[in-house]
């Protein structure tokens, strides 16, 4: 069970990290646009 849990957690962490990157990209653009109006 421990080996299966480790194998199953790796893709979950990778998908979570990828999701954070996908959400962080537009978030940074919106924050910069609202704060300064210039990128």
Curated annotation (Swiss-Prot):
InterPro entries reported in the protein's UniProt record: PSII_Ycf12_core-subunit
Record-annotated membrane-spanning stretches: 10-35
Membrane topology: Single-pass membrane protein
Phenotype of null mutants: No visible growth phenotype or O(2) evolution during growth at 30 degrees Celsius, 50 umol photons/m(2)/s. No major changes in PSII subunits, decreased O(2) evolution at high light (3,000 umol photons/m(2)/s).
Subcellular location, record wording: Cellular thylakoid membrane
GO cellular component labels: photosystem II; plasma membrane-derived thylakoid membrane
Broad class of the protein's primary localization: membrane
Keywords recorded for this protein, A-Z: Membrane, Photosynthesis, Photosystem II, Thylakoid, Transmembrane, Transmembrane helix
Keyword Secreted annotated: no
Highest taxon above the source species: Bacteria
An annotated GO BP: photosynthesis
NCBIfam families in the cross-refs: PRK13686.1
Subunit structure, as described in the record: PSII is composed of 1 copy each of membrane proteins PsbA, PsbB, PsbC, PsbD, PsbE, PsbF, PsbH, PsbI, PsbJ, PsbK, PsbL, PsbM, PsbT, PsbX, PsbY, PsbZ, Psb30/Ycf12, peripheral proteins PsbO, CyanoQ (PsbQ), PsbU, PsbV and a large number of cofactors. It forms dimeric complexes.
Role according to the record: A core subunit of photosystem II (PSII), probably helps stabilize the reaction center.
Record-given protein name: Photosystem II reaction center protein Psb30
Organism: Synechocystis sp. (strain ATCC 27184 / PCC 6803 / Kazusa)
Originating gene: psb30
């Amino acid at each position: 069970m421990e080996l299966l849990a480790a194998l199953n957690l790796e893709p979950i962490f990778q998908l979570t990290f990828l999701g954070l990157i996908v959400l962080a990209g537009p978030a940074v653009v919106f924050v910069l646009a609202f704060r300064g109006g210039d990128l």
